Amino acid sequence: MKNTLKMSLAAASVMAAMTANAGISIVDTDEGNFSVGGNVELNFNYQDRESHDNNDSEFNQDGRVLIEFAGEKYTSNGHYVGVKAQPLFESTGNIALDDAYFEFGKKDGWAIKAGRFEAYDMFPVGLDVFLEYSGDTANDLYSDGSAYTYQAKEARGRGSDGQIMYSQTFGNLYVEVGAMLGDRSNLFDGGIEGKYHGEQIDTVKDSFLVRPVVAYQMGDFKVAASVETNLVSDAIVANGVDISDRTGYGLTGNWTSGDWSVNANVAYMDAVDENNLTAGVNALWNNFGLGYIHAINEYENKEFSSWAEGDVNVSTWYASYAFRDVLEVQDFSILLGTYYTTVDNKLDQQSDASAFAEEDDLGARVRLFYEF
């Protein structure tokens, strides 16, 4: 009876805390903290894609519930250890994982983080309720025969293998050096079964990717630069050519003042027989967001003959609007989003006539979002 009463009182306290604030602080003292929080995200989607089979309109719903467990323990000299786990329960019935990492360091100083996480965002896209790109590729997955919208995130993180990062703050200056370890063949669609410029990927071994970032805050302005590259030769090979020999560069700037936030981004990838340049700008004013991204893919026939020669460009517009605190419920939002994207094939020569199709895709989404 006493245990039942204690559990009932604890449950009532937790419910009261959840009602008052987003997230629950189970422990919050000078020696450390532990909290449970999360969010719910459900999307109702419409898409009209020429790249889709039969060119049919698509209607679907997707989403997930994220639960976050986070804790830190402090020492009297300012050092700390921390852990975070974010399991995802998808509306499809699958269970996935966002972040899962351990970190230690000195508050407002240096830190070492290991596990699964995302490093510094070198291509922030603002309020991107719905953002996709023409073709069969994504901005973090290379698919042969499709244009690639490179965004300086091949070594950013949340991969299936190991990851570690060192970061430090020096006043307005922030520096981080991240590394991803292990099999990175999943960067290419199909992995070991996939292709690159028409050639079969035939051998794979573990990669070692590094990604240093330097950022500086100047009043309302922030600027950051990065580079990412693989240090292991012949980590991914197609027809005797080391296609893991890839080096990318990123530059991003942000201006935030009052209700305005503006991002400008540039990313460039130097890869085998192709170069990928992407530029983007987006703005957020109050709850309205608007953005544009343009990708230029230059192909040549040096290592692989007769695949493609010339340029393929991708242009993408997107817009979003957020209704906050719907029904006067704190942290409950309804978001509207739309995008339009197109491919412009300017190749002088290509071996596969079905590749790099000039397709126009568009979509619209209503998102229900609640943070708890």
Task: Please provide the spans of the model-predicted regions.
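Detector for outer-membrane/organellar transmembrane beta-barrel domains
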Residues: 205-207, 211-322
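Repeated loop/turn-to-beta-strand initiation elements of outer-membrane beta-barrel proteins
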Residues: 78-81, 108-112, 172-177, 220-225, ...
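Outer membrane beta-barrel
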Residues: 24-45, 56-184, 215-219
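Transmembrane beta-barrel strands of outer-membrane/channel proteins
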Residues: 38-44, 83-87, 114-116, 177-181, ...
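Residues that define the transmembrane beta-barrel architecture of outer-membrane proteins
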Residues: 32, 55-65, 95-100, 158-162, ...
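Gram-negative bacterial Sec-dependent N-terminal signal peptides
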Residues: 1-24
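Outer-membrane beta-barrel "beta-signal"
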Residues: 323, 359-372
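Solvent-exposed loop segments that connect transmembrane elements
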Residues: 50-53, 141, 184-205, 230-246, ...
